[in-house]
Regions:
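Extended, small-residue-rich solenoid/repeat segments and analogous flexible loops
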Residues: 1-67
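Glycine-rich hexapeptide-repeat left-handed beta-helix
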Residues: 2-27, 66, 72-138
Length: 138
């Protein structure tokens, strides 16, 4: 059985091609890089140029925008959005319905609360509690 593709027209009228990810069957642009150990829910999608690293999870309805990076073991919650060029650090959690703005950064181990908005270009820092959870703070 060959690889099947789904095509969408983007906001500029350019036809973009997506394939179903091996782990979870979510839609991944052919120019995105998603590790086979990452889980992409069937209702989630990863846009062109984005990268999803090892053991990351993109939850139901999650959207990883163009050129964004979701680092190792990070979790993107239900209907959460990672903006264009944003970076979600290792072991970070983006809560359900949260929005990470374009070019924003979520530090390693940080937990972005449900429905929170991280503004374009901002940095969301890990709290002491977040770091303790990971064994990184006294």
């Amino acid at each position: 059985v060959g690889i099947s593709y789904v095509e969408f027209e983007d906001e500029n009228g350019v036809l973009r091609r997506y394939r179903k990810h091996v782990n979870g069957r979510g839609l991944v642009a052919t120019t995105a890089k998603v590790d086979p150990t990452a889980f992409v829910d069937p209702t989630a999608y990863v846009d062109p140029g984005a990268e999803v690293q090892r053991h990351a999870v993109i939850g139901p309805g999650g959207w990883v925008d163009r050129d964004a990076i979701v680092a190792e073991r990070a979790e993107i919650g239900v209907r959460a959005h990672v903006g264009r060029g944003a970076v979600v650090g290792r072991n970070a959690v983006v809560g359900p319905y949260a929005s990470i703005g374009a070019a924003a950064r979520v530090q390693n181990g940080a937990r972005v609360p449900r429905e929170a908005k991280v503004a374009e270009g901002d940095e969301y820092r890990a709290s002491t509690e977040d770091l303790r959870r990971l064994g990184l703070a006294a």
